[in-house]
Regions:
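Nucleotide-activated donor-binding/catalytic signature segment of Leloir-type glycosyltransferases, i.e.
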Residues: 234-252
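Aromatic "clamp/platform" in nucleotide-sugar-dependent glycosyltransferases that forms part
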Residues: 272
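Glycosyltransferase donor-sugar binding loop
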Residues: 197, 220-234, 250
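An aromatic- and histidine-rich active-site surface loop
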Residues: 96-115, 123
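Short alpha-helical donor nucleotide-sugar binding micro-motif in glycosyltransferases
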Residues: 252, 259-264
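Conserved acidic donor-binding segment of nucleotide-sugar-dependent glycosyltransferases
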Residues: 304-315, 323-328
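Short hydrophobic beta-strand element within catalytic cores of glycosyltransferases
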Residues: 289-293
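Membrane-proximal helix-turn-helix segments that form the acceptor-binding/catalytic region
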Residues: 31, 85, 137-154
Length: 360
């Protein structure tokens, strides 16, 4: 089967790019593309133009430069359409897969009859299908939702998302995210109490982690926060540098990030919405407990006793941090529980085959 993944920066994950800190969907596209290529499928990633060479093969995956479709600039997006069409005509994929929200899903849907491919949408964030994206972006959001509904196939990454699709009259194949193989053995010691990792976006609510660090001054805190929303990032960085028990790090490439999870006792999530965070997976690989303000995909925190869910209550988040850090037996149980989640839920071969079943 020939599959083309339409993804702005997934090719940079395969390149092990030092400058770009990839988002979760980009990482998962790269991992899935590599697994599928290993199974003998013809896999292409059509990536945004960041100066990379065209037709480079990385880990068995052909990468194509599809122009500046990724910049967020409407004029550049429209100008990139001829190049995207050229790549699609040259590659002639059976399936085009889009993971995560983008107005390009509508454009690709419109191109389907002329170029002969089938279109799959894989949901990355819950907000892509629960109406939040449309409320934030009324025009592009409506086009995006129309395209989601009219795709030839859909995938969810949690059973919660599968239920949302079903409640909105759509079917979706439920598969779980893939694991990024470790490049180094897990370190023995844990020198950080509370770790927060995410790109700087409003929905990640980074200032709430700063509130937590200030509220628990005895905790050794670390924040890895690459810039995306510049104004928000500048306010976060300025404030973070005034907190004595917090180390602020601007960016860490994905192929180096696991060591930071390894060194942490507890991973903290303050987001309003996620899908299945890659950070939860990496925390599980590290034997790191979870402290989540709101996000709990498929009820995993209670199911595996992998940490504490605060019910979107900052007082409970602070209490949860203090409780786990003061009770070694509870912390150890949560760390073991999160590691067990990885063992029971995440198998690359199994989940890759489930993904493929959704394209039949």
């Amino acid at each position: 089967m020939k599959i083309l993944f339409f993804s702005s920066f997934a090719h940079l994950v395969l390149q092990k790019n030092q400058e770009r800190t990839s988002g979760g969907a980009e990482l998962q596209v790269a991992l899935l593309a590599r697994e599928l290529a290993g199974l003998g499928h013809d896999i292409v990633i059509a990536g945004g133009d960041v100066g990379q060479a065209d037709r480079r093969i990385l880990d068995g995956v052909l990468t194509r430069n599809a122009g500046k479709f990724h910049t967020g600039n409407l004029l550049e997006m429209l100008s990139a359409i001829p190049r995207v069409v050229q790549v699609l005509r040259e590659e002639r994929p059976e399936w085009v897969v889009v993971m995560g929200w983008t107005a390009w899903l509508f454009i690709l849907w419109a191109l389907r009859p002329f170029l002969g491919f089938k279109l799959d949408f894989t949901c990355s964030l819950d907000s892509e299908i629960n109406g939040e994206y449309r409320r934030e972006h009324p025009v592009f959001g409506r086009l995006f939702e129309f395209a989601v509904r009219h795709c030839d196939a859909r995938h969810s990454i949690t059973s919660d998302q599968e239920k949302v699709f079903r409640n909105r009259g759509m079917t979706a194949t439920f598969y779980r995210y893939l694991l990024m193989p470790r490049s180094t053995p897990r370190s023995a010691g844990k020198s950080v109490d509370l770790l927060w990792v995410s790109r700087c976006q409003q929905l990640k609510r980074p200032h709430l982690f700063l509130d937590l660090a200030e509220a628990v001054p005895s905790a050794r805190c670390q924040m890895i926060c690459p810039c995306e929303d510049l104004a928000l990032w500048e306010s976060v960085k300025k404030r973070a540098l005034t907190i004595s028990n917090l180390e602020f790090i601007e960016r860490v490439p994905y192929h180096q990030i696991q060591e930071y999870y390894d060194a942490a006792q507890i991973f903290v999530n303050t987001s309003t919405y996620e899908g299945f965070p890659n950070s939860f997976i990496q925390a599980g690989l590290a034997g790191t407990a979870l402290l989540s303000l709101r996000v709990d995909p498929d009820g995993m925190i209670g199911l595996f006793h992998s940490g504490i869910l605060a019910g979107d209550d900052m007082k409970e988040l602070i209490k949860g941090a203090e409780t786990m850090l003061s009770r070694p037996e509870l912390l150890d149980e949560a760390q073991q529980g999160n590691a067990r989640m990885v063992d029971e839920w995440l198998d690359n071969e199994r989940n890759t085959h489930i993904f493929l079943e959704g394209l039949t």
